[in-house]
A protein has these predicted regions:
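N-terminal metal-binding scaffold of metallo-dependent hydrolase/deaminase domains
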Residues: 1-26
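Divalent metal-coordination and catalytic microenvironments
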Residues: 16, 35, 46, 66, ...
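Metal-associated gating/positioning segment near the N- to mid-region
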Residues: 33-97
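Active-site mouth loops of central-metabolism enzymes
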Residues: 45-57, 103-116, 184-188
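Alpha-helix-loop-beta-strand connector modules within alpha/beta enzyme cores
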Residues: 87-104, 149-159, 311, 315
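Histidine/acidic residue-rich metal-binding segments in metalloenzymes
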Residues: 116-283
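His/Asp/Glu-enriched, well-ordered alpha-helical/loop segment
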Residues: 180-208, 276-277, 281-283, 288-363
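C-terminal cap of metal-dependent C-N hydrolases
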Residues: 298, 355-390
Length: 390
């Protein structure tokens, strides 16, 4: 199965490349995949390291975890510690990436330095980062300069829509649940206002923007209207915002403290409808692992994020395919073709001539999630990822 849908065929692979696709091929070593899917490995462009700490050990761990979940290519967020906003940190992060045995790891650059000045975007792009990242806390004059670089180098701008003046001390969605818990909330407008602003910048400069981890249906609506107007914008939504609501924060459950915050139940259902109607372009696990010392504390003090990377494909399959929300072919577009396109790659098809970056997925097995930092801890998932050597 690839972005074009499911079909029952044999695939011949020689020297890591697909050389033939047909019924009843013979000769050579045979892998019996009866009852399983042959899939392109997934791509996830919104991954953070343990405690957002950038070092070789954490990169290796995340690379190996990704493969367990069927994810063969990840892009690390740039707002790590240290942030990828200068040549020294970039070279430090790149050292050893070619020697990883797990998923391929790429890097994005942080367009803003800690002092809110512009990083050297041109140099960092030339040295191998796949995309510039920008939070909309950037003032308009800085955002416009970033857009000019994006226009010049013809890359996709990864944009997180948020407003510092509205976030303030907020730790979850502003709504009934936050009021009941007595926690400061973050209004949807924090995201929506800046999606609208960045759409206008994309229109003016004719640049590509991928809005990262969108949580509001209104933002999705604005982005899709912009697409109809010919503006090259797209949106990514996390699996958690499609399946879980802010009710998960009840009893001060710090695993449900995410950035962006989980939406209301009504908005979660609207996001599901947007997915069914092909209004969402990319999916992410929004994987952000934290040490227990940073999670097993008061909700206000807890780190943001949860874990899902090692369960990625079984999670997508169980919650989206078996439930009938989308098809397997559509999942391949959302988790392979479109994310790959955002970093300048062409992936998502199984056809003659392509590199055999594939996995096998057996949908008939089941397992229970055993991870206290997962929102799905204790839930049963369908499917097992099987690595194949090509």
């Amino acid at each position: 199965c690839d972005e074009d849908g499911e079909r029952k065929l044999d695939v011949r692979i020689e020297d890591g490349v697909v050389t033939e696709i047909a019924l009843d091929l013979s000769g050579g070593e045979v892998i019996d995949a009866q009852g399983a899917y042959l899939l392109p490995s997934l791509v996830d462009t919104n991954i953070r390291l343990q405690d957002s700490t950038l070092n070789a050990k954490n990169i290796k761990i995340i690379s190996d975890e990704a493969m367990l979940g069927g994810v063969g290519h990840i892009v690390l967020n740039a707002d790590s510690n240290p942030a990828i906003d200068n040549e020294i940190v970039l070279e430090f992060a790149q050292n050893g990436l070619d020697n990883l045995s797990g998923a391929k790891v790429d890097l994005m650059l942080n367009s803003l330095k800690e002092d809110a000045t512009l990083s050297n975007i041109a140099i960092l792009l030339k040295k191998g980062v796949v995309a510039p990242y920008m939070s909309t806390i950037a003032k308009n004059n800085i955002a416009i300069k970033i857009a000019e670089y994006v226009q010049m180098y013809k890359v996709t701008l990864f944009c997180k829509a948020e407003d510092n003046s509205l976030i303030k001390s907020g730790v979850m969605l502003d709504g009934n649940v936050s009021s009941k818990l007595g926690l400061a909330g973050i209004p949807n407008l924090s995201e929506v206002l800046h999606v609208s602003r960045m759409i206008e910048i994309a229109r003016h400069f004719k640049i590509k923007i991928l809005f990262k981890a969108i949580a509001s249906p209104r933002s999705v609506s604005l982005i899709n209207q912009a697409k109809k107007d010919g503006i090259d914008v797209s949106c990514e939504v996390s699996i958690h915002h499609l399946l879980k609501s802010d009710k998960e924060c009840n009893e001060f459950n710090t695993t449900a403290k995410l950035d962006p915050p989980l939406a209301s139940n009504e908005d979660m259902l609207e996001l599901q409808n947007a997915l069914k109607n092909s209004q969402i372009d990319c999916l992410t696990t929004l994987h952000q692992p934290s040490s227990p010392v940073n999670k097993e504390v008061a909700f206000y003090d807890a780190a943001y994020g949860c874990e899902a990377l090692s369960d990625a494909l079984p999670l997508y399959y169980t919650k989206l395919i078996r439930s009938g929300i989308i098809s397997m072919g559509e999942l391949m577009k959302l988790t392979v073709s479109n994310p790959a396109k955002s970093i300048g790659l062409k992936k998502g098809k199984i056809e003659v001539g392509v590199k055999a970056d594939f996995i096998l997925f057996n949908p008939k097995t089941t397992k229970f999630v055993q991870n206290t930092q997962s929102l799905y801890n204790g839930e049963e998932l369908n499917g097992e990822v099987i690595q194949i050597k090509t």
